[in-house]
Regions:
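A cross-family signal for key residues in well-ordered alpha-helices
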Residues: 17-20, 53, 87
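Basic, amphipathic "hinge/linker" alpha-helix immediately C-terminal to the N-terminal HTH DNA-binding motif
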Residues: 72-89
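Basic amphipathic alpha-helical segments that dock to polyanions
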Residues: 48-50, 54-55
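Amphipathic alpha-helical dimerization/coiled-coil segments
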Residues: 86-104
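Beta-hairpin "wing" of winged helix-turn-helix
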Residues: 58-72, 77
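N-terminal helix-turn-helix DNA-binding core of bacterial DNA-binding proteins
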Residues: 3-47
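The DNA-recognition helices of helix-turn-helix-type DNA-binding domains
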Residues: 39, 55, 93
């Protein structure tokens, strides 16, 4: 099965990937699409941008527009709530991946 067939299942991992980078510094949508592609995810703008907007509405990200006109970019950064959620998720992911990889 292709990655697109697993998109719903991978959505949580993609959100964690976004939070990870947004906690390290600012990011924008096109950069994030390329970053995800480097990790084997095929995410379209029609998938990523609604995800970013939803994460912002839920308080995990905050954004600001940099530049003007055609060069304007919406830059995203993790909020305290987003960084806290990422820390919590990391502990859960470590536990889960330990089970998946080691078969515990």
């Amino acid at each position: 099965m292709a990655t697109a067939d697993h998109q719903e299942l991978l959505g949580g991992l993609i959100r964690l990937h976004v939070l990870h980078h947004a906690a390290e510094g600012e990011l924008y949508g096109h950069w994030m699409i390329e970053e995800l592609r480097r990790h084997g995810y095929r995410v379209s703008p029609g998938t990523l941008y609604p995800m970013l907007h939803a994460m912002e509405r839920r308080g995990y990200l905050k954004s600001k527009v940099q530049g003007a006109g055609r060069r304007a970019r919406r830059m995203y950064r993790a909020t305290k709530k987003g960084r806290d959620a990422l820390a919590f998720a990391k502990s859960r992911v470590r536990e889960l991946f330990g089970e998946l990889i080691e078969g515990r």
